[in-house]
C-alpha cells in the first residue's frame, strides 16, 4: 500500500478525503470518504472543480495500483518454475533423519538441516572467520547462538524459525 502513491500524493489524497493520515490503507473508509467528497466537490453541486479533478486522479491511481497488487497471479509462482530439491513431506523437509542429519550432515541429503550445514562449512572456508546466527541459518549456529543442547526440541524451534524465514535469506 505504501508503494501505490508517493508520500506527498498519499498525504494530499488523505487531506482531500478529509481523513486522518493514520487511516491510509483503510480502503472501505477511504471509499466512503471518496463518495462523500465527490458529492461535496462536484462542480454541478457548487463544489471546487480543481479539487474534484485532483481527488479523482489520485484516488483512481491508488485504486488501480491496489487492484494490480491484489490480482491472484501478482507475484505468484508456478511449480514448473521451481526445482524439486526438497521432498514434499513437511516432516522430512527440515530434518530427514534425526539425529544422523544433526551429527553427520550429508551432501546428498535434501533436508534443510544438511543443506544449511554444508553451506556453513563452505562459507566458513571462504571467509576464514566464524559465522554466527542470522549470518548463517544452520542448526549448529542456531544452537550456539541460543545456547541450546542437541535435542529434538531445539530442532523443533529451529525448524519453526526456518519455516518463517524467506527462502532468499537462507542463502542456499
Curated annotation (Swiss-Prot):
PROSITE patterns: DNAJ_2 (PS50076). One of its GO terms (molecular function) is zinc ion binding. It is found in: Host cytoplasm; Host nucleus. Pfam families: Papo_T_antigen. Residues 12-75 form the J domain. Its main location: host cell. The keyword Metal-binding applies. InterPro entries: DnaJ_domain, J_dom_sf, Papo_T_antigen, Papo_T_antigensf. One of its GO terms (cellular component) is host cell nucleus. A zinc finger (C4-type) spans 101-114. Keywords: Acetylation, Activator, Early protein, Host cytoplasm, Host nucleus, Host-virus interaction, Metal-binding, Oncogene, Phosphoprotein, Transcription, Transcription regulation, Zinc, Zinc-finger. The modification N-acetylmethionine is found at residue 1. A zinc finger (H1C3-type) spans 120-141. The common region of ST and LT proteins comprises the J domain. This domain is essential for multiple viral activities, including virion assembly, viral DNA replication, transformation and transcriptional activation. This domain is also required for cyclin A-transactivating activity of ST. Interacts with host PPP2R1A; the interaction inhibits PP2A activity. Promotes efficient viral genome replication by accelerating both G1 and S phase progression of the cell cycle. Inhibits host PP2A by binding to the A subunit, thereby displacing lower affinity regulatory B subunit. Inactivation of PP2A in turn results in the transactivation of cyclin A and cyclin D1 promoters. Late during the infection cycle, ST may induce dephosphorylation of host MTOR, leading to the inhibition of cap-dependent translation. May establish and maintain high levels of viral genomes during persistent infection in cell culture. This is Small t antigen.
